[in-house]
Structure formats: C-alpha cells, structure tokens
Amino acid sequence: MAVTIDYSLCKGAECAECVNNCPMEVFEIEGDKVVVARPDDCTYCGVCEDVCPTGAVKVEPE
C-alpha cells in the first residue's frame, strides 16, 4: 500500500486537513505543499483520504 497526493488537486498548506488529522503524523507541510514525510509510519487507516475535501489524497496498492 502507498499514500499518494495528486498535486493538481491538493490545496496544500491552505487546507492541510490530512496533516491535521493523520493519527500517525505521516504528513508535513514544506513551503506551501503537503508531503508524505514518514511513509513507513503509515498504517493505511484511510483518515487522510476521508478528510481530503478535493480527493487529492489516496491510499492505494503499490
């Protein structure tokens, strides 16, 4: 499994719902962009995907 961000849809730091809601703190803001900073800590719970208002964050098979 992998967490991916579609940057054409992601609103980055102005939204940051994934950053603020991830129970494992997998995401970080770098500049105005959200990045998957700690992918090995991800438990693939899907919270990030559920809270993303634009559908930019996906939890998918690799």
UniProtKB/Swiss-Prot annotation:
A Gene Ontology molecular function term of the record: 4 iron, 4 sulfur cluster binding
Note on cofactor: Binds 2 [4Fe-4S] clusters.
Domain 4Fe-4S ferredoxin-type: 2-31, 32-62
Keywords: 4Fe-4S, Electron transport, Iron, Iron-sulfur, Metal-binding, Repeat, Transport
Gene3D superfamilies membership: 3.30.70.20
Binding, [4Fe-4S] cluster 1: C10, C15, C18, C22
Lineage: superkingdom: Archaea
Pfam families per UniProt: Fer4_7
Cofactor needs: [4Fe-4S] cluster
Residues holding [4Fe-4S] cluster 2: C42, C45, C48, C52
Entry protein name: Uncharacterized ferredoxin MJ0199
Organism of derivation: Methanocaldococcus jannaschii (strain ATCC 43067 / DSM 2661 / JAL-1 / JCM 10045 / NBRC 100440)
